[in-house]
Amino acid sequence: MRLAGEEFQNTSRYIALEKIISLLLARRCFSEAMTVYQRMLNENFQPSGDLNVELLAISIAASSVSEGQLERALDDALAHPSYTETGLLRLLDLLAELEISPQFRASIGQRFVEARGTGYSPSVRLVSKLVGIQARAGLVEDALNWLVRDDPETAGESPAAPKTSASYPYASMISAMKDTQSENNTAIDKILDHMRKHNVPADISLFNALISLEMRRGSPANALSLYHVLLELSKIAPITPDVFTFGTIFSVFRPRFRAHMRSVHTRHYKPANNKVSLREVYRDMIRYHSSRPIPSQFSSPIITPSILNVALRAFMSFSDYPGAFVVLRTFSMFKLRPTLRTYYIVMKYLMNRVRFDLGRARREGESRWGDRLLGLDWLDVKDVVVDQTLAEKVLAFGDRADLGDNENINQNRNRKDGSRPPFSKPSIAHIDGDKPLPPGQPLDIIPLTRIMRRAILADSKLRLGDPNSPAGDAQFSPARKVTHAIAEAKNAMIPEYVMQPCPSPDKRARKNYV
């Protein structure tokens, strides 16, 4: 039996419909949101002010009216005292999704501020949003005028607003300049000059914006130079790199910028002209984590699985396997679990190099890294097919405990019969996304570190002892060679004063870091 409409007139239904509309708008399902909106109106429900303005904007924009007509239709709502900054910020994002011009969005913000009179001071969040929109539209002078009129130092902030600084709006302007044409140099000079004239101190948001801009321009050397300036400034001012900084700098070492960072004659790492190496950047990240006022080994706003994956990708792209090993062990150091992405990065770069090594023409008797990783004689290479079966074989190296693998000491104590369950790892189907990982299944880092040890050993340049002595290298075992390479990377990447790691999350890795 269908209930009468009046039986649905209750607060719970009103709240439910509003939440449905908000969810649909967040997912950018505009037509579905309008359908629910019409349902609300038919049932004599009136949406809240902020939501009503968004729906009004959608309905008017869908009718192909001019921007002038849309602006007039929104005037009353923007001027209403109950309309909030939060609502305006959401409206500006919505108008961007509807492909409304930046000039129009800037004028909407202008009308909102003007309607509140001279006693009103917009928050830093709103000012940053508006100057960013104006900068994207090429209205740099107008944006700077906003900053003169609405000094971010005295702007109002709601208690729920994120903590911002005086330079944040300037950083927003620079970040908004997606166009990398040379004429933007003049605009950026104006922005920085404006900061100097008004004594606005630089903070990490400004440096991040400038570093990101150089990356978009394809100038990794300039990005690294800015990073070096930031490190020097951090010695005398309360400004330090954050997780965004390190994420951007690690991307300098991605394959896209390989021509800037690598030799065309080798797969090995080549330092940039400013001598900032990938291992040094990683060391900086660990150092700044450890220098926090209240350091915590297992909780960090900098050291996260995401940033470790970004760093891992950089090391793998340069075939710096000892460095990649240190990154993997950092997961254990901070009691973090690897993600499916971690496994994907390792397997992708290893298999790409295997495919490259096995596919090239070779001289008689020539042995390559890919051959040694797989344990192949050079005569057998021609019969190998690089496919999912081969990838499963490489992944299975993670089940082997060898090459000085300290994680396996006391392993027989895990079961009464002396056996031990394998460490948890995904299959290639999971890694490739062909099969979903079971919900809640944790992944272990140990299989990846075992695979990485084998990748290190496969490097023909791995040497110890006196290079001038014929027996200088032969006297050392493979395990010692691998351990030496890892220790060398660790010394370069982990500061000495950093706390030693605790056991891994599953408490099965008993020994020290290396």
UniProtKB/Swiss-Prot annotation:
It comes from Ampulloclitocybe clavipes. Part of the gene cluster that mediates the biosynthesis of clavilactone A, a meroterpenoid that features a unique benzo-fused ten-membered carbocyclic ring unit with an alpha,beta-epoxy-gamma-lactone moiety, forming an intriguing 10/5/3 tricyclic nested skeleton. ClaR, ClaS and ClaT are sufficient to produce clavilactone A and the function of claZ, if any, has still to be identified. The biosynthesis begins with the prenyltransferase claS that transfers geranyl pyrophosphate (GPP) to hydroquinone to produces geranylhydroquinon. This is Clavilactone A biosynthesis cluster protein Z. Residues 405-440 are annotated as: Disordered. PANTHER family: MEMBRANE-ASSOCIATED SALT-INDUCIBLE PROTEIN-LIKE, PENTACOTRIPEPTIDE-REPEAT REGION OF PRORP DOMAIN-CONTAINING PROTEIN. It comes from the Eukaryota. Gene3D superfamilies: Tetratricopeptide repeat domain (1.25.40.10). Signal peptide: none annotated.
